[in-house]
Amino acid sequence: MVDISLIIGGPQGGGIESAGQIAIKSMVLLGYEVLGSREYHSNIMGAHSYYHLRVQQHRPRSLKLPVDGVLALDAESVFTHFRDVRPGGILVYDPGTKSTRVDAIQPMAGPLKKRLKSLFDSRGMQPVVESAVKLAEEAGARIVGLPLKEMLKTLSERTGAPVARVSRALNTLGLASMLYMLGVPVEYIEKAISLQFAGKEKVINMNVEAVRIAVDYVREAFGEPESRLPPGPRRGQTMMVATGNDLVAMGKIVGGLGVITYYPITPSSDEALYVEKHSYISIDGPLAEKLGYDKIAVAIVQMEDELASINAVLGAAAAGARASTTTSGPGFSLMNEAVSLAVEAEIPVVVTLWMRAGPSTGMPTRTGQQDLLHSIFSGHGDAPKIVLASGDHVEAFYDAIKAFNWAEEFQTPVIHLLDKYLASSMVSLAREDLDPSKVPITRGKLLDNPPADYRRYEVVEDGISPRARLGSATMVITGLEHDEYGYATEDPVMREIMMFKRERKFKVIEERIPDEEKAVLHGDSEASVALVSFGSTKQPILEALEMLRDEGVRARFAQVRLLYPFPGRLVEEMLEGVEKVIMVEQNLLGQLAMLLRAHTSIKPDSSIVKINGRPLYSFEVAGAVKRILETGEERVVVSHGS
């Protein structure tokens, strides 16, 4: 079985993401499935950034440590990752950096410098790159030194371009060296470069030449690789690679998106930028004949702030467009008043909330699950809304469509909850993984020809009034309490009628949304140990279940997808007969555990939490579960990741 993990590290702005994506595309072209995630600081240039990827014959569920290869394109990357290489793995670095001291690296975090100096002092070593490399070698890593400056000079001579220009191919020199040593055929690396830089012939030629220089050097200095990586099961098939940002954007587009607004904020901006690149959509068949043209467009607007973003889509949704805004925690804080307006005015809007590590600005480029309660209780007053959390990339695609359907069917805001890890991690996908026909577009009680005596807030049995597009009938839309026509009122009887009307919708939501959309039970349904979680922890937990099973530990996993209205009855059924309930969350307060206590009779026994802003790993979950079963600890904090 092929199972390869790599880390590519270097300075922010040093082509780390490009290198990671070239590595991913090389492996996918060779026939393998890949998961890759970029970790980066919240600055533009200089600070440490790295790409962590895993390659398997099936889609990887989790990233893995230690790794088979670390490519360190600068001194800071050596210091940060020299302990991440498994025995027998390779550490690729530039020996020209061996005398660089820890203190000389300005962007490096002070606490990390102190930990490194303490480590080197304990071993009687100087705090320099050479010491880190020696410790890696003592731990069993194979050291591969690349004279990157000399290789850049060679590239400059061969291309006729100045060193300053070809230095942009530094990442390719290092990456090609590592991939070749791991047995990846050169032609796949070169083809991946052509895909990565499609339409940029000069850039492609420069990087392909860099590959050849790197491979020639490795052959001469280290010989041929011990073995060639054989073709994987997907070779020759049409595959795609996409991030969570990409897939949510795709889901919205195929789900009928008409208007999207945003104010730039990490990690949501890339979703909006993907829509911008694909905002003109070709159509054919009956729809094209009906409309009289062969293209439709999505309106995308970068607003002046998050208040404007959500209020603009409220207007668009009221006018009949499928409308959405995308943001992260700080931006969503500014949207709270408008969320309450959407509840009161019964406007079907979708807010995509990409969680990151807070509070406040927190760590803008790191992941977390700290906005669960924020999303549920957003908006002042009694302001219920639907909150849906995607567990992985494929779910994110389909949930983006479902969010629109539910918003329009139930005429209420839908908060689509995701996180930074899903946003920036990239997976390989087959065409059949994404089938829009599985989620047909439904628009609820949308009227094409409203009656003359149209009442926007007509009191009906299910609480969901017929909805006309703004401008197609006389109506008043307001944040004030109102009567059936929308006219403001403070009449106590009408107030109760409207409050109960909106409440009835949520009873209907509980009835109409299928159980499989509310929560999913994975693993051994008879096991006495159960894990409960939501969001992007899904796939690491699923792999952890397999690891635990191999060690004789049976466990089940209740993945909660619909966070509001909370499916208490269903979750209780899933956990029936369980003796040990373990929560898995990436927040410190145990926000899902709070909901579980509030909506069920279940009291969790223990929790596994990760709060350092890095992705959750399957081995962390498996190890923590075993520790809890052995010691009975109430909370285990896991902390891997650089």
UniProtKB/Swiss-Prot annotation:
Read off the InterPro entries from this record. Answer: 2-oxoacid/accept_OxRdtase_asu, 2-oxoacid_Fdx_oxidoreductase, PFOR_II, Pyruvate:ferred/Flavod_OxRd, Pyrv/ketoisovalerate_OxRed_cat, Pyrv_Fd/Flavodoxin_OxRdtase_N, Pyrv_flavodox_OxRed_cen, THDP-binding
> EC class of this enzyme?
oxidoreductase
One GO MF term: 2-oxobutyrate synthase activity
The EC designation for this entry is 1.2.7.11
Classification via SUPFAM superfamilies: Pyruvate-ferredoxin oxidoreductase, PFOR, domain III, Thiamin diphosphate-binding fold (THDP-binding), TK C-terminal domain-like
What keywords tag this UniProt record?
Oxidoreductase, Pyruvate
Tell me about pH and activity: Optimum pH is 8.5.
Please indicate if the UniProt record lists Oxidoreductase as a keyword.
Answer: yes
Which top-rank group of organisms is this from? Archaea
UniProt motif (YPITP motif) ranges: 263-267
A Pfam family assignment: POR
> How does activity behave across temperatures?
Optimum temperature is over 110 degrees Celsius.
Q: Show the catalytic activity.
A: a 2-oxocarboxylate + 2 oxidized [2Fe-2S]-[ferredoxin] + CoA = an acyl-CoA + 2 reduced [2Fe-2S]-[ferredoxin] + CO2 + H(+)
Q: What assembly does the database describe for this protein?
A: Heterodimer composed of an alpha and a beta subunit.
Q: What does this protein do?
A: Catalyzes the coenzyme A-dependent oxidative decarboxylation of different 2-oxoacids such as pyruvate, 2-oxobutyrate, glyoxylate and 2-oxoglutarate to form their CoA derivatives.
* Domain comment quoted from the record: The Tyr-Pro-Ile-Thr-Pro (YPITP) motif is important for the turnover of the reaction, presumably through its flexibility and mobility.
Q: Which PANTHER family match?
A: PYRUVATE FLAVODOXIN_FERREDOXIN OXIDOREDUCTASE DOMAIN PROTEIN, PYRUVATE-FLAVODOXIN OXIDOREDUCTASE-RELATED
> How is this protein named in the record?
2-oxoacid:ferredoxin oxidoreductase 2, subunit alpha
The organism of origin for this protein: Aeropyrum pernix (strain ATCC 700893 / DSM 11879 / JCM 9820 / NBRC 100138 / K1)
